[in-house]
Amino acid sequence: MHELSLCMSAADIIREQAEQHGIARVTDVWLEVGALADVEESALHFCFDIACRDTVAQGCTLHIDVIPAQAWCWDCSREAEIMQHAGCCPHCGSERLRITEGDDLRVKSLEGE
């Protein structure tokens, strides 16, 4: 379950950002998850709660935005938006795609008091 390691990394970033900005308690966190990141949303919520235990983010509300992946088509030389690994280019139908974005997880923003 790689969700736990992703959430531990996100919790580290949240702690660092809260400290830098003088936030004593984080109330909300927004994560962007790429469509190809291979994470289970319910597992992400569960692991996030564990990763944030005993931190400034304990008990915060987690918001998850799934963003489409971007790929480069080798056959028609165009960018394409895809939502799954076995995607085809919407422009030419080719399966020869190189993922350029959307297989990661990032902390988009946070709110606190």
From Swiss-Prot:
Amino acids binding Zn(2+): 73, 76, 89, 92
GO molecular function, one term: zinc ion binding
Keyword Zinc carried by entry: yes
Keywords of this entry: Metal-binding, Nickel, Zinc
Recorded coiled-coil stretches: none
Domain of life: Bacteria
GO biological process: protein maturation; protein modification process
UniProt keyword Acetylation present: no
Alphabetized PROSITE patterns for the sequence: HYPA
Record Gene3D superfamilies: 3.30.2320.80
UniProt-annotated binding residues for Ni(2+): 2-3
InterPro entries: HybF, Hydgase_Ni_incorp_HypA/HybF_CS, HypA/HybF
Membership in a protein family: Belongs to the HypA/HybF family. HybF subfamily.
Biological role stated in the UniProt entry: Involved in the maturation of [NiFe] hydrogenases. Required for nickel insertion into the metal center of the hydrogenase.
Name of the protein in question: Hydrogenase maturation factor HybF
Record organism: Klebsiella pneumoniae
Protein's gene: hybF
